[in-house]
């Protein structure tokens, strides 16, 4: 296999401890699969590709993978999606979002970065047209 082909297959994973409170990334995949730390339980995994080259260099990777257990889904992800008018996780695919770090109310959990704005827009504009 050619080196260039191998490079296309592997994307370095960003170090979560180096991510800023907000960043922009394009969602590449959303899948529900078994939680690797708690076999028998499912979690939702969101894979997003960072869009800022300087950030990619500083976090040492271009891909962010966020795991949302059911408690994270209920408290953080679902409310964020509802604010954006998203009714299905499939609607996240292929779109670029601003992600924001949020901490759940329960102890012992790391922050999760949730989508808070689509392409820098937080929702529908309420401005009236000048015409």
What are the language-model segments listed below?
Residues 1-131:
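Short beta-rich binding modules
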